[in-house]
Regions:
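Mobile amphipathic helical/loop "lid" adjacent to a hydrophobic cofactor/ligand pocket
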Residues: 69-70, 74, 79-179, 194-195
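Glycine-rich FAD pyrophosphate-binding loop
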Residues: 26-50
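Short beta-strand to alpha-helix junction loop
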Residues: 60-67, 140-146, 155, 191-213, ...
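N-terminal Rossmann-like FAD-binding beta1-loop-alpha1 element of flavoenzymes
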Residues: 7-34
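Glycine-rich active-site loop/strand segments that organize a redox cofactor
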Residues: 46-65, 127-139
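Conserved flavin/dinucleotide-binding core of flavoenzymes
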Residues: 309-421
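Helical element adjacent to the flavin cofactor pocket in flavoenzyme catalytic cores
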Residues: 185-238, 242-245
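Mid-domain catalytic core of redox enzymes
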Residues: 2-4, 228-335, 344-345
Length: 421
């Protein structure tokens, strides 16, 4: 398709936020154009298929409790493969289980006698998770906003359970070990993890953006067209200038700040690195997240992806993912350290596992320290220039989808179009 000269709205960025915005604009009958600088849609959500191995661009999962998800995709059509609810924690050579108090109520006695924290700790954590799952969202966001660490301490949880289970868990979720993330964000994470099921599409996480983009008219998706400049009523791409009534910048945080330097400060971001290993046999049989409770702070979490989704590995083999907070160069030394840690965590040798890939995501998640203004930062920057993404909402897949939808609604309102779609 040749680039049009004029449309109502130009969306820059074909990730989850941009695609979600396009869906709402399309439903409203507004003329739009989406420009994506890379050779594919999906942004940070992507899957590489190499010799039969499906490796997502970093360890990512989809939560069925995300409110925006069912409005954008048919969850059944994604052919989901689910992980076991709860987590396993390796501590002092033993595996301990921390259950989801809502999803596994019959497992509560086993949970309460597990070696993670005290009995009081586990009762208090169950109360906190249940409160986050059952209170209305507005009540959660009305609570005083502090850091995640302060929220956990205020709930009466001991230093031991925070360090042995909750810091490792939240480190992988937030890509940050400090627990400085807003308590409002943490409460919403506990809410979704407790209420929903966690899994991946059988075809890989790339199936999610593909499903969101599916109903969109392909000619209005301009792939491989990099936006060079943005201004009121115009976008300049490598193909020329497009005039418009409104612009939505739905790139990653750094890209948005680069296009709107005088209007949008560059946000802090956190990075993640995922090591993918192939093995002839799974180190454990269960599809469950494994955390390091020994406070070594090397691997945030690990999971045998193929235990949940056999489609991720060829010929009955096993795919193991290990995620590290930050950027870890794929050097021989770091690989050796990761193997040693995985062997300790799983309790089996990892020497003969094949290192398949090391995926570093420099902008995995935006930082979300307090205050987070009820998880909704301003999206209209003036002159009908709008910004969308998880850096304007919650740092998550839900935040990206909801942020794109919210921004499209604001654009429709500014154009005098019908918003209630």
């Amino acid at each position: 398709m040749s680039q049009p000269v004029e449309v109502d709205v130009v969306i820059i960025g074909g990730g989850l936020a941009g695609l979600s915005a396009a869906r709402r604009l399309d439903r409203a009958g507004v003329e739009w154009l989406l420009v994506e600088g890379s050779d594919r849609l999906g942004g940070r959500v992507a899957t590489d298929v190499i010799d039969g191995w499906r490796m997502d661009r970093g360890f990512q999962t989809l939560n069925t409790a995300y409110p925006r998800l069912p409005a954008l995709v048919d969850i059944d059509a994604l052919d989901m493969r689910y992980f076991t609810s709860g987590v396993l924690v390796r501590r002092c050579g033993e595996l301990h289980r921390l259950e989801n108090p809502l999803r596994e109520p019959l497992a509560t006695p086993q949970t309460l006698i597990s070696g993670i924290g005290t009995l009081t700790d586990r009762l208090k954590f169950a109360a906190l998770a249940t409160r986050c799952a059952t209170l209305p969202v507005h009540r959660l966001l009305d609570m005083p906003e502090v850091t995640t660490q302060e929220m956990l301490r205020a709930a009466g949880l001991s230093h031991r359970i925070i360090e042995e289970a909750l810091r490792p868990f939240f480190s992988g979720v937030f890509a940050d070990r400090s627990l400085d993330t807003s308590s409002h964000v943490a409460a919403m994470v506990l809410r979704s993890f407790t209420r929903g099921r966690i899994g991946v599409p059988a075809a890989g996480m790339a199936a999610l953006p593909a499903a969101i983009a599916g109903p969109l008219p392909f000619p209005q998706l301009l792939i491989g067209a990099r936006a060079l400049a943005v201004g009121p009523g115009m976008v300049v791409t490598e193909g020329g200038e497009v005039r418009c009534r409104a612009v939505i910048v739905a790139t990653d945080p750094a890209g948005a700040a680069a296009l709107l330097p005088d209007r949008l400060p560059r946000p802090d971001v956190h990075s993640l690195t995922t090591f993918y290993f192939g093995a002839d046999h799974a180190p454990i049989d269960e599809p469950i997240l494994l955390l390091d409770g020994d406070r070594r702070e090397i691997i945030a979490n690990s999971v045998v992806m193929s235990n949940a989704a056999p489609e991720y590995a060829p010929g009955g083999k096993s795919l193991i993912a290990a995620t590290v907070v930050g950027i870890s160069a794929p050097s021989g030394a770091s690989e050796t350290v990761i193997r040693v840690e995985l062997s300790r965590m799983y309790g089996v040798p990892a020497d003969d596992w094949d290192l398949l890939s090391v995926v570093t995501v420099p902008q995995a998640l935006p930082a979300a320290r307090p205050p987070q203004t009820r998880l909704r930062k301003p999206i209209h920057l003036g002159d009908r220039l709008f910004v969308a993404g998880d850096h304007r909402d919650s740092p998550s897949i839900q935040g990206a989808m909801a942020g794109g939808w919210r921004t499209a609604g604001a654009v429709l309102a500014s154009l005098g179009a019908r918003v209630g779609v």
